[in-house]
Amino acid sequence: MKRNAKTIIAGMIALAISHTAMADDIKVAVVGAMSGPIAQWGDMEFNGARQAIKDINAKGGIKGDKLVGVEYDDACDPKQAVAVANKIVNDGIKYVIGHLCSSSTQPASDIYEDEGILMISPGATNPELTQRGYQHIMRTAGLDSSQGPTAAKYILETVKPQRIAIIHDKQQYGEGLARSVQDGLKAANANVVFFDGITAGEKDFSALIARLKKENIDFVYYGGYYPEMGQMLRQARSVGLKTQFMGPEGVGNASLSNIAGDAAEGMLVTMPKRYDQDPANQGIVDALKADKKDPSGPYVWITYAAVQSLATALERTGSDEPLALVKDLKANGANTVIGPLNWDEKGDLKGFDFGVFQWHADGSSTAAK
């Protein structure tokens, strides 16, 4: 009996120690597209989050506690995003890095706000997200209201086209950016011949290409993602159309070159700066390459910065309450791989720079002149 009692007591102690160890893990939901047409953007996000968590834990974690990433796939689909958000609530996770697409982030954010969960999005750029008075929603990405004017300024001052078409994919991200560019161009009395939408996932753009030729369009701005832009470029060049194309960071992806081939050469794209070329980030670049991950994608770094920001607030406050972390970040900012970040009361960054780049057929890019 005594031996059995000792065994039971030892088992109870081991179980208690096990539960204590489990309690020391700080779970962080990482949500993005593992599937769907823009899963490659999700790859950037997950790679950035994984590397950030790995690096933070290697330095001792949060006061000795480890960050644990729990990954979810929303496919950049609004309905799936809502299901994922509810799953995160049921899983008892207090912090979310994600979502990536504006169209999936906004409905998910309603749930996080209601449940008091902190969400830091590294990719949702639509301004509406943070204009609803929510207290638990932040982002490390710049806004369409900044990226759009950057594109418009370059179009007006450098390209100086005569006849412009603006096209979008009818989604929150793409249409929002297209309207922002249109506003900038119209304010300067530029000749925007037409503004029209296509359907995301569409592959046959023969009617659109014919319209561009008929209207003598010499410049196209497309608000959307790389699958459609790649098809547009390939089909336009196949019929001899030499119109200049431009898009946002959603088109700046190596997969675009796989779709468009040589037709990708010379496309213009607005993107964040190349954080992988910052000497201060060389150690992270080397670690990513050693793990056979591409360090060049912007969302690798913007997501890494989102995780860093969360970790900074957890370490600095010693609190696990989401609202306390939000208040700390808004008051004190965070130093990250993309530079020092400071947020306004809405949860938007006070400054985020976009540049204009020229895309090349091999999937690389260089600063546009």
Curated annotation (Swiss-Prot):
Pfam families from the UniProt entry: Peripla_BP_6
InterPro entries: Leu-bd, Leu_Ile_Val-bd, Peripla_BP_I
Signal peptide interval: 1-23
Record bears the keyword Transport: yes
Keyword Transport carried by entry: yes
Cell location: Periplasm
Major localization class: periplasm
SUPFAM superfamilies cross-referenced by the UniProt entry: Periplasmic binding protein-like I
GO cellular component: ATP-binding cassette (ABC) transporter complex, substrate-binding subunit-containing; membrane; outer membrane-bounded periplasmic space
Keywords attached to this entry: Amino-acid transport, Disulfide bond, Periplasm, Signal, Transport
GO molecular function, one term: L-leucine binding
GO biological process: branched-chain amino acid transport; isoleucine transport; L-leucine transport; phenylalanine transport; valine transport
Disulfide cysteine pairs (residue numbers): 76-101
Family: Belongs to the leucine-binding protein family.
Biological role: This protein is a component of the leucine-specific transport system, which is one of the two periplasmic binding protein-dependent transport systems of the high-affinity transport of the branched-chain amino acids in E.coli.
Name assigned to this protein: Leucine-specific-binding protein
Native species: Escherichia coli (strain K12)
Taxonomic lineage from the root: Bacteria, Pseudomonadati, Pseudomonadota, Gammaproteobacteria, Enterobacterales
